[in-house]
């Protein structure tokens, strides 16, 4: 998959465009720490920002050094550590992704993990 990665000043984040038509903006704001339930509630009615999917976070993790360099160059905050995804594993667990390697695992939804907002949409 070919990617275009650049800073988007309108969203204060990194804009990733894929050759499959996915457009993903990663917030340059710091990651928050909260439970999965709190993260889902926090982004529930947000029209722009959302909790990323496992696929989105693994795409970001695959190019994390380049993405973090762009974030740093524009005064934003690097992405590190384990981040919640919007994807549930089962009734009690949800998926989270290690941004320093791309590994995904499930963990209890009541546990606190990092959360970084994305804005995702399909261009075509």
What are these regions (language model features)?
Residues 1-49, 81, 85, 93-96, ...:
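Extracellular adhesion/carbohydrate-recognition regions
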Residues 54-124:
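C-terminal, surface-exposed recognition/capping segments
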